[in-house]
């Protein structure tokens, strides 16, 4: 991708069959024109067809127009404001529960452990589930699905539906369909039970969706509910776990960064409120820089043009796919001097426009869980750094690898837990008690 930019400039084209052109954009001014253009000029949902086998036709990611806007407004509230903050203590407790089981003085892969935390958090947010047989089954099935879809073959399988078919006992297509069928059974069973015994006092997302009515007074169908729940389960934990793992790596790879963060955390009161933690400037800067240097998604969700359009001096024809490239913009030396260097201070020195820094996409397709993901990142990092003495098991640099549509650290980042800090000396210890 970077070599193409160096060779062809800030707008280059790839061919994706049937005469369709896929344009990668990395000029912030051009990206601003795309993200501020009338959304009606694009088929953004149709551009995400490779997600259909997992999230279904009724997913927010595949919708356009009024229906997309209606679903977006419905799903936004739980991930913002007071509803989001209500999950703060849960995040700290779940982090402590998982980390307390880590082996002492022997290496372990961090990423799978952080994914346990993120999946538990999203199961609570979406279903209100923290334990029980269904919760355990969903954890196991989601783990199996991610192993299938984030493998190299799984990435190829997403682009070629013929590979998703069942060709026998050893075919990946059979295993994929089996796992999806089992997940669907769990989701539909939960929907039926909750619809039958509806409890409006519950605050989870499924309750909100069950109570929702469209302009004609009709509730969402079971299939619509299933597709939105599946979208939230997939998008709501794997990406966040990857971002947190990258942050843990950088903090422990660079001693000066870790020392500065620990000093900032130590400045908190003995029993701070969660708002004080998430407002810490250097902690914020670490999270922002983590999402800059290796953004979880390399591009925004692409947009298919419905009409001819001239943008930034370029003429684009209908059916062209436009993809603002997050990674290439975040690596521009004119915006970020020494872009391959992890330096959180750059976010304390200046502000960047939403077309210069956009790890969660932009416009009406911006990730609805962006605020929640950052909230979770900060609280997980603060809990781990104040509760545990951790070191990297290996000093060599960790390189990024493609994990499905995300960019993850190769090897999952090996850590060694040396022990726990004294609970008396840790400022957020009281939030981690079960």
Would you name each region that the model predicts?
Residues 43-51, 67, 83-242, 260, ...:
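Cytochrome P450 heme-thiolate monooxygenase catalytic core
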Residues 1-70, 85-97, 117, 129-134, ...:
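N-terminal membrane-proximal hinge/A-helix region immediately C-terminal to the signal-anchor transmembrane segment
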Residues 88-92, 139-145, 200-207, 250-297, ...:
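Cytochrome P450 I-helix active-site segment
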Residues 70, 230, 235, 271-278, ...:
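Cytochrome P450 heme-thiolate "Cys pocket" and heme-binding signature region
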Residues 168-175, 283-299, 303, 410-434:
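C-terminal domain-closing interface element
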Residues 306, 324-350, 431-432:
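Conserved cytochrome P450 K-helix/beta-meander segment immediately N-terminal to the heme-binding cysteine loop
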């Amino acid at each position: 991708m970077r070599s193409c930019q160096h060779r062809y400039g800030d707008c280059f084209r790839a061919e994706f069959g049937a005469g369709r052109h896929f344009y990668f954009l990395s000029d912030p001014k051009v990206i601003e024109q795309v993200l501020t253009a009338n959304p009606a000029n694009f088929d953004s949902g149709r551009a995400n067809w490779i997600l259909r086998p997992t999230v279904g036709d009724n997913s927010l990611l595949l919708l356009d127009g009024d229906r997309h806007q209606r679903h977006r407004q419905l799903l936004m509230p739980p991930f913002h404001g007071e509803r989001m903050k209500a999950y703060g203590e849960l995040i700290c407790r779940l982090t402590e529960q998982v980390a307390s089981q880590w082996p002492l003085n022997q290496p372990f892969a961090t990423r799978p452990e952080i994914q346990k935390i993120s999946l538990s958090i999203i199961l609570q947010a979406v279903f209100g589930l923290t334990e029980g047989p269904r919760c355990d089954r969903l954890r196991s099935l989601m783990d199996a699905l991610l192993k299938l879809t984030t493998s190299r073959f799984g990435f190829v399988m997403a682009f070629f539906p013929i590979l998703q078919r069942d060709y026998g006992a050893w075919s990946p297509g059979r295993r994929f369909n089996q796992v999806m069928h089992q997940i669907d059974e769990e989701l539909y069973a939960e929907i039926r039970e909750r619809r039958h015994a509806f409890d409006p006092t519950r605050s989870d997302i499924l309750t909100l969706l069950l109570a929702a009515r469209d302009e004609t007074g009709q509730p969402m169908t079971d299939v619509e509910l299933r597709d939105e729940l599946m979208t939230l389960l997939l998008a709501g934990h794997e990406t966040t776990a990857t971002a947190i793992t990258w942050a843990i790596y950088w903090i422990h790879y660079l001693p000066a960064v870790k020392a500065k963060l620990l000093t900032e955390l130590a400045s908190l009161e003995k029993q701070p409120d969660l708002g004080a933690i998430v407002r810490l400037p250097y902690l914020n800067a670490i999270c922002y820089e983590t999402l800059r240097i290796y953004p979880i998604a390399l591009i925004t969700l692409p947009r298919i043009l419905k009409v001819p359009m001239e943008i930034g001096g370029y003429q684009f024809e209908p059916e062209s796919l436009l993809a603002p490239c997050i990674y290439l913009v975040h690596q521009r030396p004119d915006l970020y001097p020494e872009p391959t260097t992890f330096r959180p201070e750059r976010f304390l020195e200046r502000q960047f426009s939403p077309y210069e820094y956009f790890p969660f996409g932009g416009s009406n397709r911006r990730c609805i869980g962006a605020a929640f993901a950052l909230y979770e990142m900060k609280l997980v990092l603060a809990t781990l750094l104040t509760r545990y003495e951790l070191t990297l098991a290996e000093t060599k640099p960790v390189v990024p690898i493609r994990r499905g549509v995300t960019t993850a650290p190769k090897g999952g980042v090996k850590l060694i837990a040396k022990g726990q800090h004294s609970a008396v000396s840790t400022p957020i210890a009281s939030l981690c008690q079960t």
